[in-house]
A protein has these predicted regions:
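Aromatic- and histidine-enriched alpha-helix N-cap/loop-to-helix transition segments
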Residues: 1-2, 29, 95-100, 177-184, ...
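Long, well-ordered mid-to-C-terminal structural blocks that present hydrophobic/aromatic surfaces
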Residues: 190-230, 235-242
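His-Asp-centered metal-binding catalytic motifs of divalent-metal-dependent phosphohydrolases/nucleases
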Residues: 18-41, 101, 206-224, 312
Length: 362
């Protein structure tokens, strides 16, 4: 989804404001993630062959598997998920997602290719990936990334989070990457935004998703500094945050076009504060009630930072509980899970009963 964001921004710059349906892009990414969680561990060539010949049956299987999990979500969202696969159309957003998928595949494949170019059939795999990317070469973002310069540098740095482990000092199963965590927070924030009891404007949905997707981006430069360390010395948390902001401005933002910097800062700075934009200024600390009553309009760019924070903690709680349930646990892991649970037990935040959600996963 990071690559899809970059491609979509370039495409929007080329074709004009409104040319990219960002909600369709975000939901398409979530739909494809859900689809592949059911049809996991299938090699891409096999997967595409299966979808071509038995797509209807496979999609029906996916819908049945996810029916219980999606129960309670917005009914229109559930229908859009089904329509995405049953009424397949070659929209710009789908092409962007496909291009992003193949570029991500190429990025991972290069690591293997340079390590073991002698593997049987590896050159054919390389050719297949390159052919798929060529089919999307008309997208200006694809061309920019393939230049291997600044845009590729940004994606390459983000890609490193694919190999950066969460809770690296504590043995856990399953292990989770920082990049995977970022997507889970983004997708969950988006789903929660639809369930807040008010119809969120499209910019609010957009901001809550991408703030989740980029909220841990500075960790590519500072690594995963765990909360106990941040809180062990008074003022250390502020020092780390200042350093992250400095590194963002010096290392990451220069890799992106200047017009994008404002959005990227909006996503990654003070990310756990409710905020809006008014008269070209960012206003922090806006209450959930005020966002709903006064600022739930695209012109104010509302962002629910408090929601993002609790979803981030929920993701950490689930990561810990999954490992404990698998029998891989430690005193530190159990204590972390219990502390997070007690922090949100019985609380309702941004219109959502998170106490009930935490209790479900306990």
């Amino acid at each position: 989804m990071v690559i899809a964001y970059v491609i979509a921004r370039f495409e929007e710059e080329r074709m004009g404001q409104g040319s990219v349906d960002w909600i369709a892009l975000i939901e398409g990414g979530i739909f494809e993630f859900l689809h592949r969680t059911v049809l996991t561990d299938i090699k891409p060539p096999v997967f595409h062959r299966m979808m071509k010949e038995k797509g209807y049956e496979l999609n029906k299987h996916v819908f049945e598997k996810l029916e219980m999990d999606m129960d309670g979500l917005d009914k229109n969202f559930q229908q859009r998920f089904k329509d995405y696969y049953l009424k397949s159309t070659n929209t710009l957003e789908r092409r962007i997602l496909r291009a992003a998928h193949y570029l991500a595949t190429q990025w991972e494949f290069k690591i293997i290719y340079h390590t073991a170019p002698f593997i049987y059939g590896i050159d054919k795999t390389k050719e297949n990936i390159e052919n798929q990317i060529e089919d999307h070469y008309d997208l200006i973002g694809v061309q920019k990334i393939l230049l291997g310069k600044k845009s590729f540098g940004f994606i390459d740095l983000c890609g490193q989070l694919r190999f950066q482990k969460r809770w690296a000092h504590i043995p856990r199963i399953p292990e989770t990457s920082v990049l995977g965590h970022m997507f889970i927070v983004a997708a969950t924030s988006y789903l929660c935004t639809m369930e807040m009891g008010i119809e969120a404007c499209s910019k609010r949905l957009y901001n809550n998703f991408y703030a989740g997707l980029f909220h841990d981006l500075p960790e590519v430069l500072t690594k995963d500094i765990i909360s106990p360390v941040k809180g062990s010395v008074e003022g250390l948390k502020d020092i780390i945050k200042d350093y992250e902001d400095f590194q963002m401005n010096e290392e990451l933002l220069p890799l992106l076009p200047r017009p994008w910097h404002e959005d990227m800062k909006y996503f990654s700075e003070s990310e756990f504060n409710n905020k809006i934009k008014k008269n070209q200024k960012v206003l922090l600390g806006i209450s959930f009630h005020d966002i709903n009553e006064k600022y739930n309009k695209n012109e104010y760019h509302p962002l629910d930072g408090e929601l993002l924070h609790v979803v981030d903690r929920l993701a950490a709680f689930i990561e810990a509980k999954l490992s404990i349930d698998h029998g891989i646990k430690s005193e530190e892991l159990e204590k972390a899970a219990e502390n997070i649970f007690q922090e949100y037990n019985g609380l309702k935040i941004s219109g959502i009963d998170f106490g009930r959600i935490f209790n479900y996963f306990r």
